[in-house]
Amino acid sequence: MAVCLCALAQSATWAKVDLPDIFSDNMVLQQQTDARLWGWSEPGAKVTVGTSWSGNVVTVDADKNGKWTATVETPAASYAPQTLTIADKDGQVKLSNVLIGEVWFCSGQSNMEMPLAGFDNCPIAGANEVIATSAQYKGIRMATVEKNGQLSPVDRCQGKWKVCNPENSPRFSATAFFFARMVNSVLDVPVGIINCSWGGTMVEGWLPRDTVAKYPDIDLKRDIRKEEPHDWWHYLSPTLMYNGMLRPLEGYTIKGFLWYQGESNVGKHKTYAQRLKTMVDLWRKEWGQGELPFYFVEIAPFGKYEGRASAFLREAQYKAQSLIANSAMVSTNDLVEPYEAENVHPKDKRSVGSRLAYQALAKTYNIKGIEADCPAYKSMEVKGDTVVLSFVHADNGFNRMKGMEGFEVAGADREFYPAKAELMGKNQIVVVCDKVSSPVSVRYAFHDYSPGNVANLRGLPLVPFRTDDWDW
């Protein structure tokens, strides 16, 4: 009898409405929208969803596989804790301490993954103080998706919402946290972050199989690691992160995407911009929320001065902005100390997160007075042995008149030499080199590691550039 009762109790537990991890206590729902919820019950079962902020109850039917989907209308953002009650005939699940605010989906590789606690021998600047005081940010919540490479798309991934405090925050993505902190401070609303990232991944890892199968440089039989279990090195494979980490979250109602990736695509710059666009187009389509904003980070300087492979990747990232509507890139060219030259994980993530936040605040939330775009090359004019450069996003000038570093000039022989650069007028730069009498091309910070020192008046750095289209 005891065995039978136990079995019946267990059966009832299994039958109760089932939710994915992303719907948990402490979650943040996007404000003033129809927020999407889903889960599982018995096939054909009626499922009800009730909220503490409304007297309305939404009733939906589970499909033949037990999957159900519902939407609830959310109010304006508030720090007041809310509850959701989701029930079927066998029981109910109550989600507590739910906040209504702004939700952003963050993805990429290790520099997005990198937590406030840092990686081995790779610290985050100021982390101890940030972690110690993190409980004061009661409106910041983060769900960190566990790494999960899968050969085929799955319905579930692990990773529940956590409140911000010294116990939880060391595992929060540093870049995403600093983004959330800035947005929370300016808008004074709760901010939820879904961190779905995995160090070392290529852009192809976040795309589905049918898309990647069309790429001539990828052989799925060769490139997908099929051995079980799906271990840490599966980041090397295409499609696996899309299948196991991103696909289960598609449809969670968000405000936009943040992306920090590219180091693993160095050497593949000719295909990167288009593939990034393909990824963004696909994500937007599958989320079904229209042209969601997509703000992304230029990879930071790393490696040897002599190399240029990562410089070409940065150039591809900058070009991607013109391909992807409602997108913008933030530069990080000024954020790496000399001793970090061969460290792909620089310590300054506060500036990265803040620059992403400037983009969102200025362009998504329409906050006036915030500079968001880094100055960038527009055109050149050769006058004898001198080149006059013009720029966009530099209407108010630059941070220095002389002592500009990182410029090079080449003639028809394509040999580059360090050049002297000075401000002309308010927002043009004059470049000259005594070794090049007939200049053909100018480059700025166009090496694997070659930080420049030019920025606009708000401290946003000049994006690395070249005026030529040579292969190297």
Which sequence ranges carry the predicted segments?
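Bacterial Sec-dependent N-terminal signal peptides
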Residues: M1-K16
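Cell-envelope and extracellular/periplasmic
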Residues: W14-W472
